[in-house]
C-alpha cells in the first residue's frame, strides 16, 4: 500500500497508521489507534472565536476517530457541537448513493462558524457529499450574516 504523509506526521502517528492497515489487528488495538489519531488531529486544530466548531461524522467514525478529536477539543476547552449521520450506502445502475437513514444534530449546531468533517475512509465522495449537503440545506444563513 502506498501512502503519502506530510512532514508534520509524528512517529507515533505513523505507528498508529501502520496499525490500521495491519492484517489481523485486534479490535482493541484498532480502536485505540483510531482514537489516538483523532486526538492528534484535535490537538492541532486551530483555536477560533467563541463560536463552537461543528464536528460532522458518520456513525461508524463517531466511536473512535471523532471521539479522539472531541477529547482533544475538550482538553483544550474549545467548544464544539456534533452532527452524526447514518447512511445506507449502495450502488444502483452504476451510481453510488448514500441516503441518510438517521441523524443526530446537537442543539445549537447551526451557530457554528467552522466545520470539521471527520471520516476515516473515503472511497468516494458520495457519503461525505450527501451529509454535507444535508447540513448546508439547514443552515440559517441570515443568522450567520447578522453575526
PLM region spans:
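PRPP-associated nucleotide enzymes
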Residues: 1-147
